[in-house]
From Swiss-Prot:
Napin 1A and 1B are minor component of the seed 2S albumin. The sequence shown is that of napin IA. CDD domains: AAI_SS (cd00261). The small, basic, water-soluble napins are one of the two major kinds of storage proteins synthesized in the seed during its maturation. This is Napin-1A. SMART domains: AAI. The modification Pyrrolidone carboxylic acid is found at residue 32. Disulfide bonds join 5-56, 18-45, 46-93, 58-101. It comes from Brassica napus (Rape). Belongs to the 2S seed storage albumins family. The keyword Disulfide bond applies.
Amino acid sequence: QPQKCQREFQQEQHLRACQQWIRQQLAGSPFQSGPQEGPWLREQCCNELYQEDQVCVCPTLKQAAKSVRVQGQHGPFQSTRIYQIAKNLPNVCNMKQIGTCPFIAIPFFP
């Protein structure tokens, strides 16, 4: 299972659009990179998730969140936000059968 999801994560280029979407949400200003970016990014991110095997959606989102956190040198508060944004993405993408990912939004796990 983990290997398979790891592979999907790599195939989907580490959910690049989802990582950008998370960053954008974190910054709290969707207009930073132009207003047309927000909805477009969300759509791209959702498409990345739709490509994946359902069982991999949450594990790969967790990886994406981790990448964002590691790249950004975020403090504990922001780290928590990153995971909260990531775990809610299946809802944002209307993936009702997945809903909110079960991983916990805490900053300190590896």
